[in-house]
């Protein structure tokens, strides 16, 4: 760790040594993986990444709107991924590097209620009065449901095939146990 408490080196017998370098503002300006491959990033005065250059020289550029929302990523091969936001600053539409479009709609409480792709597939979501997601329905009609305790902690999720994962918490709300449908913790 450095004097600011940030990780500067991680060593692992399987993955080698990873190195982290930060700029004066605390942004991760250089990351070197265990194989010695480095990614170097440049940031604006707000700490938003403007570009990153990988170990083979590919440059990825990032653009933002006046509110700081990421609006476009342009990859080294010239392809791009763009995002558009509604008047509330919520992601409304994104177009991936292959031209596929996904649109998003929200309720008055800013909860995502649907996501649709350009092939007509739609995912829908429901919530309780506190904003906890109660269900998620995929385009094929399969639904996953969620339950919560009085503190708002997720206690179970049950998928469309009836498989249930459960979660337990201590009095402080810290997750103490997570068990999947097969009983693995």
Question: For each of these PLM feature ranges, what is it?
Answer:
Residues 1-12, 16-33, 37-54, 58-75, ...:
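Beta-strand elements of repeat-based all-beta scaffolds
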